[in-house]
Amino acid sequence: MTTDLNQNPYLVRAQQLLCRVPLIDGHNDFPFIIRGLYQNNLTRASLNDLPIGQTDISRLRQGSVGGQFWSAYVPNPVHSDKESDEAYLECLRQTLQQIDVIHRMVSEHPDVFGLAQSAADVWKIFRAGRIASLIGIEGLHQIAHSPSALRMMHKLGVRYATLCHTKNNRYCDSAVDRHTSSPWSEYGGQTHDPGDEPSRNVRTGFHSLTLKYLTAVHGRIVDLSHTSEATQRDAIAISKAPVIFSHSASSSLTPSPRNVTDEILHQLKRNGGLIMVCFLRDLVNSADDANTTGSRVVDHILYIAETIGYDHVGIGSDFDGMLEGPLGLDDVSRFPELVADLFRRGVSEERIEKIVGLNTLRVMKQVEDVAVREQAEGSTGVLCDVVKPIWTAEQRQMLAEQGRTRGLRP
């Protein structure tokens, strides 16, 4: 991948295309870099040119980024019981901090960013010359077992939810967690025995309701990156709306539990969903590839496109979730070179437009439409938190007596 604009006609075409269609990246952990470097104190931060990481305003502009899903990532609790409140409430607190820092990043740089909550918002912000900023959470451990928290996160702009990260949770299994000792049947899950695979899925009970509710709450996208294959299979079967993989790649090209099998890809196509190809070296390299290059990312994009069609592939870098990206595609400034390589390989302009952003916008709009329809039909109820009693039996009796004096029964 060359960076010489004068010597690369494909790069010229790439820059022209990215002026017309927003390049929307499915996953970037820049907010976690801000947390680590500045403890979320933006008064100390210069976001224009950061000394570390793969993202800052200067490089976003160089990379012609039109839209970005910022991850409000918080790690899984360490050594905690799945049902203990304390560890998960801390995850929820930190999640709110990360959502807040994204909001402040946008509000303190209004000439650069705009908060997008719909596909229409993305177009409006992009056409105004700004970067449409969307929010995702990376694992349902971040909601602390609280549907109320999930609803409030939507009001704060969270538009996709990854079902899990690197640990199993009460909703589904992770691709990389082999620990299966907790009593899953309490929550309605089915057990099966696929060898070394995690032993739970999302098909029944609480999990199924939660999955449907994710979509029905005003159009939240279900993200299956990091989930086990069994979870992927069941989630796609359950979902009435397109799902995404926000940062994954093909397991046929690079075998990894984090990547997606051809079988799941074909299910994803039938669902109308989208896989956004990750740049993480371990997910895109080949066995004999000592130095992973950006061209390897293009290999994955083209393999997926040829397997299930150009309507179902996008870009999900995972920048700032890795120490270094592929050679030639090592930070957000290099996106145009990825597009140039697609041109060089003979991909049509129409298909590249789909890859860089139109597919993502289609999925967003379809999920929004499903949510509107589900709410209009009243087909999805309201999930409620388990709320601990706040009154004693005596207090309840006293209040009930007051009601009875008015001819009412509580």
Curated annotation (Swiss-Prot):
Domain of life: Eukaryota
Disruption phenotype: Impairs the production of acetylaranotin and accumulates chemically stable intermediate cyclo-L-phe-L-phe or shunt products such as 2-hydroxy-2'-ene-cyclo-L-Phe-L-Phe and 2-imino-10'-hydroxy-cyclo-L-Phe-L-Phe.
Binding residue positions for substrate: H165, R258, D318
Keywords: Dipeptidase, Hydrolase, Metal-binding, Metalloprotease, Protease, Zinc
Protein name as annotated: Dipeptidase ataJ
Stored Gene3D superfamilies: Metal-dependent hydrolases (3.20.20.140)
Chain's role: Dipeptidase; part of the gene cluster that mediates the biosynthesis of acetylaranotin, a member of the epipolythiodioxopiperazine (ETP) class of toxins characterized by a disulfide-bridged cyclic dipeptide. The first step of acetylaranotin biosynthesis is performed by the NRPS ataP which produces diketopiperazine cyclo-L-Phe-L-Phe via the condensation of 2 phenylalanines (L-Phe). The ataC domain of ataTC then catalyzes the formation of bishydroxylation of cyclo-L-Phe-L-Phe.
GO MF annotation list: metal ion binding; metallodipeptidase activity
InterPro entries to which the protein is assigned, alphabetical: Metal_Hydrolase, Pept_M19
Enzyme class: hydrolase
Gene: ataJ
Sites where the protein binds Zn(2+): H27, D29, E138
Family statement: Belongs to the metallo-dependent hydrolases superfamily. Peptidase M19 family.
Protein's GO biological process: proteolysis
Catalytic activity: an L-aminoacyl-L-amino acid + H2O = 2 an L-alpha-amino acid
Region (Disordered): 180-200
Organism listed in the record: Aspergillus terreus (strain NIH 2624 / FGSC A1156)
Keyword Hydrolase (UniProt): yes
This protein's pathway: Mycotoxin biosynthesis
Cofactor names: Zn(2+)
EC number(s) on file: 3.4.13.19
